[in-house]
Swiss-Prot record:
It is an enzyme of class 3 (hydrolase). Its EC number is 3.5.1.-. Disulfide bonds: none annotated. It catalyses: N-acetyl-L-cysteine + H2O = L-cysteine + acetate. The keyword Secreted does not apply. This is N-acetyl-L-cysteine deacetylase. Involved in a cysteine salvage pathway from S-alkylcysteine. Catalyzes the last step in this pathway, i.e. the deacetylation of N-acetyl-L-cysteine. This pathway is likely important in the catabolism of alkylated cysteine generated by proteolysis of alkylated glutathione formed in the detoxification of a wide range of electrophiles. Pathway: Amino-acid metabolism. Binds 2 divalent metal cations per subunit. Is most efficient with Zn(2+) and Co(2+), has only a small activity with Ni(2+) and Mn(2+) and no activity with Mg(2+), Fe(3+), and Fe(2+). NCBIfam families: amidohydrolases.
């Protein structure tokens, strides 16, 4: 989508809600004007976009979300976390407890969209669409609150901080916000999927994320006298090549793994062999056994290559989110909801990006969707944008998904 589109809309909404006649709540006792709601959600998203905040620093974002919820009479839950908002919407009748989650943090990126509502915080941008996620969940919350009396169970809203830091979900779990919850639903915008389309897949959808840093210690020497030292540059070069054989020769070719060295640093001048070289990178996998296999081989290969060149290697390994694996039963119910919302459902290709929503799925069943937003640039790009007509559709999708799980006659798949 061209920047001309975004520049033209300014603060107005010259378009009609795409397919507004199919986004209807007329079967409910409390009908909602979705055209009005759409404009409200676009305004919310633009406010969030102008005032992005980094992981663990989402103080104004937290206050804004609380204000939006309190204005609708939605009950805020207590929390020991400094940022993030958690709330409940309980129906009149008993039933499962379902969580809906959106992440709220931004990235340390200087925005280059040229939008009239671009970030006002220098060097910080919602370049992964978490403003979209937050607005969409607020919209779903408003719809659920309007129809609270008809809910057959309870909805918990998780406005999660620090997803980009990789551990926000674990803090939410430690805070007890998943206690008593039977299933969890989330989504992520996808700029390469058209608006009106949702990607749903059982099993692995996003990769486990591991990060490594290896400091290779040698003995410095004059470049003209290499025999007087132990060259860590040679060792690092050999190690980088050898590490690639883990994927090509150790991992089953029917499985999937990525090992990338993204940084190498060593030496300060042209005629001196340095004492140390540091390499850093990441491993991505979709299977826990493969993840462990790659890690074990990584340490073994690093030790052996270093020893071969009389070097010492110090490895720091950071384990990030596990593979994100969607539950079959829950995903089936969410697929039903997507069809009811008149969305096109596709089977998406798994993404090698990571998502800490996976931590929730280690505790309770759930489903995570890719939601089409039709942008020109991928996540974390300084010109990243979303098509705002997707916001109301995402809200309605989350609303219908929550309702479908609550209304399901197959509650044994959700709760005991």
């Amino acid at each position: 989508m061209s920047l001309d589109y975004w520049r033209n809309i300014e603060g107005s909404y010259p378009y009609q809600t795409t397919g507004n006649d199919i986004l209807t709540l007329k079967e409910e006792s409390n009908p909602v004007n979705l055209s009005t709601l759409e404009k409200q959600l676009i305004g919310i998203r633009r406010h969030l976009h102008q005032y992005p905040e980094l992981s663990k620093e989402e103080f104004e974002t937290t206050a804004f979300i609380k204000k939006c919820l309190k204005e609708k009479g939605i009950q805020i839950r207590p929390t020991a976390l400094k940022t993030g908002v958690f709330a409940d919407i309980a129906g009149e009748s008993e039933g499962p407890a379902i969580a809906l989650r959106a992440d709220i943090d931004a990235l340390p990126i200087e925005e280059k969209t040229g939008l009239p509502y671009a970030s006002k915080h220098k060097g910080i941008m919602h370049a992964c669409g978490h403003d979209f996620h937050t607005a969409a969940l607020l919209g779903a919350a408003f719809l659920l609150k309007e129809n609270q009396d008809s809910l057959k169970g309870k909805i918990r809203l998780l406005f999660q901080p620090a997803e980009e830091a990789g551990a926000g979900a674990t803090k939410v779990i430690e805070d007890g916000q998943l206690d008593g919850i039977d299933a969890v639903i989330g989504l992520h915008n996808k700029p390469d999927i058209a608006v009106g389309t949702v990607g749903l897949k059982t099993g692995p959808l996003m990769a486990a994320v591991d990060r490594f840093k290896v400091e290779i210690e040698g003995k410095g020497a004059h470049a003209a006298l290499p025999h007087n030292g132990f060259d860590p540059i040679i060792g690092a070069s050999q190690l980088i090549v050898a590490l690639q054989t883990i994927v090509s020769r150790n991992v089953n070719p029917l499985q999937s793994a990525i090992l990338t060295v993204g940084k190498i640093n060593g030496g300060s001048t042209w005629n001196v062999i340095p004492d140390t070289v540091v390499i850093e990178g990441t491993v991505r996998t979709f299977d826990s056994e493969v993840r462990n296999q790659v890690k074990q081989r990584f340490f073994a290969v690093t030790e052996q290559i270093s020893a071969a060149f009389s070097l010492k290697a110090n490895v720091k390994w950071h384990s990030g989110p596990p593979p994100l694996c969607n539950d079959e039963a829950i995903t089936g119910l969410v697929r039903d909801a997507a069809h009811k919302a008149k969305l096109q459902v596709i089977d998406p290709a798994p993404s090698t990006a990571g998502e800490d929503f996976a931590y929730y799925l280690e505790h309770i069943p759930g489903s995570f969707a890719f939601f089409g937003t039709d942008g020109d640039h991928d996540w974390h790009h300084p010109a990243f944008t979303i098509d705002e007509t997707a916001i109301i559709k995402a809200s309605y999708f989350l609303y219908e998904s929550a309702k479908r799980l609550l209304d399901s006659n197959e509650e044994s798949k959700i709760s005991d």
